[in-house]
Amino acid sequence: MDVEDENETLRRFFEGHDINGALEPSNIDTSILEDYISKEDSSEICFPDIPSSVSYASPQPCGSSGVHLSSVLSNVGHTGSINSGGVHHLGQQMAVRPGPGPTCGGPPYPPHLNCNNNNAMLNPKGYPMCMSNQGLPIKAEPKTSYAAGTLPDSPPDSGSEAYSPQQLSDPHLLRTMTPENICHITPPSRLEHPPPPHLQGPLPPHSIHQQHYPSMQRELYMKVESMMPQYQNLGPAMPPADLHHAQQSQMLHQLLQQQHGAELPVHPSKKRKHSDSPTNTLREQISNGGMVKSEPGLIQDNDSLNGSYLDPNYQSIKWQPHLQNKWVSLYDASYKELPMLTYKVDADKGFNFSTGDDSFVCQKKNHFQVTVYIGMIGEPKYVKTPEGILPIECFFLKLNGVKLEAINQAISIEQSQSDRSKRPFHPVTLSLPPDQVTKVTVGRLHFSETTSNNMRKKGKPNPDQRYFLLVVALQVQAQNQTYLVAAQASERIIVRASNPGQFESDSEVLWQRGQLPDTVFHHGRIGINTERPDEALVVHGNVKIMGSLMHPSDIRAKESVEEVDTTEQLKRISQMRLVHYHYKPEFASTVGLDENAAETGVIAQEVQEILPEAVKESGDLVCANGETIENFLVVNKERIFMENVGAVKELCKLTDNLETRIDELERWSHKLAKLRRLDSMKSTNSHTGSSQFSRAGSVPYKQRPPKVMGKTVPGPAHQSCVSQRFLQATIIALVIIMAFSVISMTTLYVLNLRSEDDMLGIDGSLTPPGSCTLTFFRQIHLTLPYALCTGSSQNFDTTQLKGNTTPPPKITKSPDWQQDPPLTINLCMDPPCEVVCCPHILSSESPTITRKTSAASAETISQTDPAPSTIIRKAKSRNLDKNRNSLQTLPRPVSPLPPYTQGKNKHSPNSLPVRDVRKRRSLEEESTPITPMDRTQGNSNDSRYSLTSLRLLETDALITNRSCSSMDTCGSGNYTYKLPISKYSPLSGSLSLELNSSSPVSVNFCETSKGKGCQEPAAVTSPRDQSCPQGTDVCVTQVSPTSHLWSLQLLPSQDFTFHLRVSPPGASGCDDLSIDPSQVTDYYFRFYRLCD
């Protein structure tokens, strides 16, 4: 019988059946195609292209003319397609019906690969051919001959994708054809030259539309898809994504308008809409039965190719570049070198990681599948080889295995067929469109042999285990030579035999039932929330333990035991810094911690400097955002806890020592208290003890009779005992008497010192008439004693102290003129001057002082002299040492309180209300003048503004700390000077006071206070100077910011005081509340008149 054409056969077949029903394989009559299928499977015949109306009875020889590529490209505009869920577009890879080659001989490169640049067809045996680089990129893959069978596409135990392509010429497909797979069959455009005349026959009625579509014998099935999306970073020459999308949409519209009316009849209900069609899928049948898919939709971006694939948490097997030194460079048509293409390999299935073997394991009987992503930048035309730049004939994908210990030894790869047979895997010819990503998936692969030394030893991996590496290489052919473009090799792989009893399951090896009931044994490391544990148990997150953590501590398991120095542990703990912190969000999400939880702890880098053995490196840590922390440090808090134990022990030792010392101090305190009580009792009985000691000392000493040599004088037996006791009692009595004597002498000495202080001190109290007061007036180099007698005409220079070893110098003066003490202010400008006496009035009432402030407000303050003057009734000679002669006790001033102190406080802010202790100074100390700044300079922390020197211009005398009323009134922001005025000075007048400072200050007059008034003569002028402001007794002339000249008006009173305040520059007055009181210094100048 004549063999019908495929199109005609299919058309007649579907016209005779109801396609609305279920077209099951059992319901299809395939008797019409039996003869055709049986003859087509022969590999020794070739079928030429014939029109659809021509039939032939015998196959044609291989020498028949084949398809010419030029004819296909010249008529590409007449493309026709059916609505099968996909459309053609610009640059789409189109299928070409293979035709016979010039000869049936094998190609020069592999035995089954024909790469001829001038031939656009596949050999009859169905091996891949090389694509011409001229014109539109075209993929053409033939169908390999298979014997008829009834096996399904995939083995039942395989999860791989269907191996057999959905072709019309596939006998198995014809038996299992359904309307669903028919809808996906698109007749590719056949734009060829007319067949030879002897093969032409009558055209069918619709031949006007079918003339370019010859028989579909040996056709390839291709599902058309949308154009692959562009890479994000393919280079500047790549068109933008929006322009590419616009071109794709335009070409889609053109192809839809060019569809021919005469198409295969398909039921409308079985048509798939364009929106329902699967996108991003391109299936091509290769010569050895592998599936080549182009699914760029699975590629997210360029970062996913480079970054996420290197993530250590990636689930699949890892790949690394292989033989990079042998990679060649590609060039475009203008001989410009193209950028390196993007090449990524991914193992979809077939490899499982074995924790016990620490490697990926592949069972030889199971399939493994590999997907390759190739991103081509530009259109390659040439390749640079050691022989020079050669034109590219084709690209192909090659898979093979190599041994890890010898990578030059290749392991062949096999591929399963539909009938479960295995054939060697041959390279896959590829067409790489420019500026696009091509996805190629090859499935049903097996290693041809297994690795060596796979047998386990005692349930553990064999130490002599051998490994394979799977190499996926992209190669290019030029002038019958192959060159490596890119290649990647996998991690080490163990390939095991198919006998499951030969190996134990990984689950059984890792997790086993323990020896005790309800126990499980695991061999290896465990990671919770992490896939790469570096310890026996690694937990990323919090751990909750309701019990206790136990640690080994048996002495029998320890050696080199040494006790630590707790002192060093305390020092290390004191150096550690405790901080509050939050973990970074990217780190917390990686290790399973709460991002907002606040933690308290230490810093590993700081602990590493103090306690290095408590810090350990745990390798690099990759966070969720891709950031890598190199040599991540962890802290052993158990080690720090033991440091705390040692530090606490050291603190306990220190506490015990302190308690011991406190107990000793308490015992000594009790003993001292008892001694004080005994001293007080002895001081009361010191007189009695002295008299007894005197009487005991007056008893005559009884000499013992001399001893006669060689003769013993007998005596009473009890006499020696009595004498021994008497001697002991005498010694004890002498010791007690001596102690009493020392205590009595000390007490008397202290009492005498106090009496002398009262006798020699003058504090400004009233002196009764007829008495003399001994007063010492100091000079810098001389101290002269004077006796001030009230109501007596005796001169000062005639009263001398009796018993002085050095009499005072004699001073000769006129009867009407008497020299005042050296520090007395004498305003007598034209001596001799008249005596102006302002006598002290004896009264029981305290003097009344009227204080004048800068606001002209007056208040009356009642003050009582703190200590009465001492009246010397008898002039008793007394020898005084130099220190005693150099002492001076000046009357205590009645100083007004500063305005910022409390009215009840009678002392300076830094002084205590205690009795002034008489301080001793030597003549050498007195010889050095002390300025008001001597005390403030001693305190470097004092920030007060003060003066450096005070000088009276009338007498050209410096006012120093010797003029202080007491040592406690000069310092800490308060200086009170007591200045005597001679009786020869008038009641009115002025004093010029020069104030100097080391830095600019502001000097303000605060207030004036005066005591009892004197009987002012009528001739005395007004005390106020007309040049001074009204209402004040002072006027100031500022010479410079550091020098001030004040004019003080004398007041007709027994004593009067001027109050000046030194403040920071810019102070408005004494009542300026914006000035800090700790920065001001108050100066009180108290003048009192000498009457007698």
Swiss-Prot record:
Residues 646-677 form a coiled coil. Residues 752-1092 are lumenal. Residues 1-730 are cytoplasmic. SUPFAM superfamilies: p53-like transcription factors. It comes from the Eukaryota. Residues 246-507 bind DNA. Residues 145-168, 187-210, 258-282, 681-714, 798-817, 849-945 are annotated as: Disordered. The record marks 552-553 as: Cleavage. Pfam families: MRF_C2, MYRF_ICA, NDT80_PhoG, Peptidase_S74. GO terms for cellular component: cytoplasm; endoplasmic reticulum membrane; nucleus. Residues 553-662 form the Peptidase S74 domain. GO terms for biological process: central nervous system myelin maintenance; central nervous system myelination; oligodendrocyte development; oligodendrocyte differentiation; positive regulation of DNA-templated transcription; positive regulation of myelination; protein autoprocessing. One of its GO terms (molecular function) is sequence-specific DNA binding. Gene3D superfamilies: NDT80 DNA-binding domain. Glycans are attached at residues 941, 961, 974, 996. Keywords: Activator, Autocatalytic cleavage, Coiled coil, Cytoplasm, Differentiation, DNA-binding, Endoplasmic reticulum, Glycoprotein, Hydrolase, Membrane, Nucleus, Protease, Transcription, Transcription regulation, Transmembrane, Transmembrane helix. Residues 681-695, 849-867, 928-945 have a biased composition (Polar residues). Residues 196-205 have a biased composition (Pro residues). The chain crosses the membrane at residues 731-751. Its EC number is 3.4.-.-. Homotrimer. Belongs to the MRF family. This is Myelin regulatory factor. It comes from Xenopus laevis. The gene is myrf.
